[in-house]
């Protein structure tokens, strides 16, 4: 892609864009929540729809001139519904967190009880962490994971639900590598008369491709981001049963947002079309295969993998098992051109800014074209670096990263 107008009119921003392009192309990104949007998605994101204000919904706008914007939003809605086999879709949320806020507004009043996964166990800030708006406005009860298996214990979830009678039960996480029993959660929600919400932001692409169980048949409402495994623009999406459609739409607008971002909705529509192609199913299957390969390799080399493996696109490594903190491991990998994030692990004794683990994901490198054989080699060398911390191994991995990034560029023609 060319940026002639930016280069001419704002050389400072152009230089930063050039540097970011170099960074993305010359490093391997193993951050589980990041991916590479297609150039078609990027074009839509920067399209002329940026200029259009469109408060309201298709055929019910508060501004004139929305005839084409209506068609864009309708197309995005229909594509999302078909992709996930959902009754209703709202494509206006600006982010996953705002999608979650809209759900809370639709079903709850301040002080109502939410039962959700704790941040420490792998949940998300927006599900009721004390520092978040959700944690301040609602009564939050958290479930965690079993100390031995490090997986969700539905018996604990049911016990807490029966004790606290939540109005809303949330399943979904930001750092959980295993399948979630959505049907089991549904049964618990029914026992206490709770709304059941799933935040599938991390796994949405895998769900769309059919390589991960779908929460849509079981949940009253499902939220997600549209980037991550969906490879779309940064944004949010809400899916729900038909009976909740009016409440959800009213909560999004005028509840938590004003005008939608029509250019982002156009980019979402482009991504949803891409996600419906057979090639996306192949890609998503490879994402999971790559993640399983890396997790198995780390474990075989003596790096402890939280829960013992993965069922999706991510894994958590307990790097204290090789004498590192998460912060140290993140910095060590950055030196050789591998990008990860430090991450707390269940029952972590270290503070979040240090952490005992790192989170690793395969969506980005799989989009570039890496397959299980390269992922195995990468995990082997990363493990050796964790254990030896030697300059010789650093040099070897730098060479591997250079070889892989040149063989599999993030964007062809970009450098």
Curated annotation (Swiss-Prot):
Localization terms from the record: Cytoplasm
Cited PROSITE patterns: SHMT (PS00096)
Entry keyword annotation includes Amino-acid biosynthesis: yes
Residues at the site labelled Plays an important role in substrate specificity: 227
Pfam families attached to this UniProt entry: SHMT
Entry keyword Amino-acid biosynthesis: yes
Domain of life: Bacteria
InterPro entries: PyrdxlP-dep_Trfase (IPR015424), PyrdxlP-dep_Trfase_major (IPR015421), PyrdxlP-dep_Trfase_small (IPR015422), Ser_HO-MeTrfase (IPR001085), Ser_HO-MeTrfase-like (IPR049943), Ser_HO-MeTrfase_PLP_BS (IPR019798), SHMT-like_dom (IPR039429)
Cofactor names: pyridoxal 5'-phosphate
Positions of (6S)-5,6,7,8-tetrahydrofolate binding: 119, 123-125
Reaction it catalyzes: (6R)-5,10-methylene-5,6,7,8-tetrahydrofolate + glycine + H2O = (6S)-5,6,7,8-tetrahydrofolate + L-serine
GO biological-process terms attached to the record: glycine biosynthetic process from serine; tetrahydrofolate interconversion
MF (Gene Ontology): glycine hydroxymethyltransferase activity; pyridoxal phosphate binding
GO cellular component, as recorded: cytosol
EC number(s) stated in the UniProt entry for this protein: 2.1.2.1
Keywords in alphabetical order: Amino-acid biosynthesis, Cytoplasm, One-carbon metabolism, Pyridoxal phosphate, Transferase
Pathway: One-carbon metabolism; tetrahydrofolate interconversion; Amino-acid biosynthesis; glycine biosynthesis; glycine from L-serine: step 1/1
Residue numbers of N6-(pyridoxal phosphate)lysine PTMs: 228
Gene3D superfamilies linked: Aspartate Aminotransferase, domain 1, Type I PLP-dependent aspartate aminotransferase-like (Major domain)
Protein's job: Catalyzes the reversible interconversion of serine and glycine with tetrahydrofolate (THF) serving as the one-carbon carrier. This reaction serves as the major source of one-carbon groups required for the biosynthesis of purines, thymidylate, methionine, and other important biomolecules. Also exhibits THF-independent aldolase activity toward beta-hydroxyamino acids, producing glycine and aldehydes, via a retro-aldol mechanism.
Family statement: Belongs to the SHMT family.
Complexes and interactors: Homodimer.
NCBIfam families tied to this protein: PRK00011.1
Name of the protein: Serine hydroxymethyltransferase
Gene that specifies this protein: glyA
């Amino acid at each position: 892609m060319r940026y002639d107008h930016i280069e001419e009119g704002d050389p400072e921003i152009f230089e930063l864009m050039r540097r970011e392009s170099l960074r993305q192309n010359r490093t391997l990104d193993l951050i589980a929540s990041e991916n590479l949007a297609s150039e078609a998605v990027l074009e839509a994101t920067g399209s002329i729809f940026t200029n259009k204000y469109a408060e309201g919904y298709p055929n019910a706008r508060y501004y004139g001139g929305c005839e084409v914007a209506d068609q864009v939003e309708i197309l995005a809605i229909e594509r999302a519904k078909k992709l996930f086999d959902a009754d209703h879709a709202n494509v206006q949320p600006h982010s996953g967190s705002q999608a979650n806020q809209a759900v809370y507004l639709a079903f709850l009043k301040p002080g109502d009880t939410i039962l959700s996964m704790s941040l420490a166990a792998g949940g998300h800030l927006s599900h009721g962490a004390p520092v978040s708006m959700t944690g301040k406005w609602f009564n939050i009860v958290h479930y965690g994971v079993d100390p031995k298996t490090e997986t969700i214990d539905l018996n604990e979830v049911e016990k807490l639900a029966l004790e606290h009678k939540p109005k809303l039960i949330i399943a979904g996480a930001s750092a959980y590598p295993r399948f979630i029993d959505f049907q089991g959660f549904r049964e618990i929600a029914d026992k206490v008369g709770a709304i059941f919400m799933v935040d599938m932001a991390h796994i949405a692409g895998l769900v769309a491709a059919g390589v991960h169980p779908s929460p849509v048949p079981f949940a009253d409402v499902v939220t997600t981001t549209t980037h991550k495994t969906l490879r779309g623009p940064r944004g949010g999406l809400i899916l729900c049963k038909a009976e909740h459609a009016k409440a959800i739409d009213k909560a999004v607008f005028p509840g938590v947002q004003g005008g939608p971002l029509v250019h982002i909705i156009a980019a979402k529509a482009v991504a949803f079309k891409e996600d419906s192609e057979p090639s996306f199913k192949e890609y998503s299957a490879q994402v999971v295969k790559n993640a399983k390969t890396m997790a198995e390799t780390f474990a075989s080399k003596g790096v402890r993998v939280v829960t013992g493996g993965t069922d999706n696109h991510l894994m958590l490594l307990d790097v204290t098992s090789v004498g590192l903190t998460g912060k140290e491991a993140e910095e060590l990998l950055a030196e050789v051109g591998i990008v990860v994030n430090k991450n707390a692990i269940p029952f972590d004794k270290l503070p979040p800014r240090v952490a005992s683990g790192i989170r690793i994901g395969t969506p980005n490198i799989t989009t570039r074209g890496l397959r299980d054989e390269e992922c195995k080699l990468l995990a082997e060398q990363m493990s050796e670096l964790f254990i030896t911390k030697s300059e010789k191994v650093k040099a070897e991995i730098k060479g591997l990263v250079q070889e892989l990034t040149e063989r599999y560029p993030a964007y062809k023609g970009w450098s």
